[in-house]
């Protein structure tokens, strides 16, 4: 039985993964470009 809190946490984690993916790739690209 899921409450609103659990659903919100799952959506927050999903959004974090979706946003963190490109952010990490961009960070690695910028670090690689500097070096």
Curated annotation (Swiss-Prot):
Q: Which GO BP terms apply? A: photosynthesis
Membrane topology note: Single-pass membrane protein
**One GO CC term, this protein:** plasma membrane-derived thylakoid membrane
Query: Where does this protein chiefly localize?
Result: membrane
Query: Sorted alphabetically, which keywords does the UniProt record give?
Result: Membrane, Photosynthesis, Photosystem II, Thylakoid, Transmembrane, Transmembrane helix
Describe its assembly.
Answer: PSII is composed of 1 copy each of membrane proteins PsbA, PsbB, PsbC, PsbD, PsbE, PsbF, PsbH, PsbI, PsbJ, PsbK, PsbL, PsbM, PsbT, PsbX, PsbY, PsbZ, Psb30/Ycf12, peripheral proteins PsbO, CyanoQ (PsbQ), PsbU, PsbV and a large number of cofactors. It forms dimeric complexes.
| Stated name of the protein | Photosystem II reaction center protein Psb30
Q: Which organism is it from?
A: Synechococcus sp. (strain JA-2-3B'a(2-13))
Q: Which gene encodes it?
A: psb30
């Amino acid at each position: 039985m899921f409450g609103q809190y659990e659903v919100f946490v799952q959506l927050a984690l999903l959004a974090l993964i979706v946003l963190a993916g490109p952010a990490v790739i961009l960070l690695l690209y910028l670090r690689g470009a500097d070096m």
